[in-house]
């Protein structure tokens, strides 16, 4: 697993895993899997967490060790692709498949659907992504700007 995850990630995962390893036996309860994964920034649904457990033949009342947990986290992270999720959301809004969405329509969707953004949050997002208030937002450019890795100073 070390070839897929950095040592820093493994250390962070171990620290969080240890908080839920109440009896300090190197295991967490299967019922805690979803919580631990979310604490580490993953976004599994309850169904996804259950499928991970089933893949490893772990009963809902069972336990999993750290090695299994690392494998599960790796699989979850691999399937969570923000670029793909953003593209799918934009394609749903683009009924005519033009390859772009009007900024006004994107603003409306961001403020009304899902985890609603405020007007200021949308304005900040548009400013950072270089989107004109009444312009066209091309998917590929928008996704590229949104998913640029943040520099670690």
Swiss-Prot record:
Domain EF-hand: residue ranges: 8-43, 44-79, 81-116, 117-152
Protein name: Calmodulin-like protein 4
Record-linked InterPro entries: CALM/Myosin/TropC-like, EF-hand-dom_pair, EF_hand_dom
Gene Ontology CC annotations of this record: cytoplasm; microvillus
Signal peptide as annotated in the record: none
Natural source organism: Bos taurus (Bovine)
Cell compartment(s), UniProt: Cell projection, Microvillus
Record keywords: Cell projection, Repeat
GO biological process: brush border assembly; microtubule cytoskeleton organization
């Amino acid at each position: 697993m070390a070839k897929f995850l950095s040592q820093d990630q493994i250390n962070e995962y171990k620290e969080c895993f240890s908080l839920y390893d109440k009896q300090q036996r190197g295991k967490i309860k299967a019922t805690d899997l979803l919580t631990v994964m979310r604490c580490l920034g993953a976004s599994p649904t309850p169904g996804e967490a259950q499928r991970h457990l089933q893949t490893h033949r772990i009963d809902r009342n069972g336990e999993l060790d750290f090695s299994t947990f690392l494998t599960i986290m790796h699989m979850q992270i691999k399937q969570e692709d923000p670029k793909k999720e953003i593209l799918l959301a934009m394609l749903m809004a683009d009924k005519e498949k033009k390859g772009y969405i009007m900024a006004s329509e994107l603003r409306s969707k961001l403020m009304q659907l899902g985890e609603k953004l405020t007007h200021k949050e949308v304005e900040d997002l548009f400013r950072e992504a270089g989107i004109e208030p009444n312009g066209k937002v091309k998917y590929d450019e928008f996704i590229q700007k949104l998913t640029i890795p943040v520099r670690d100073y």
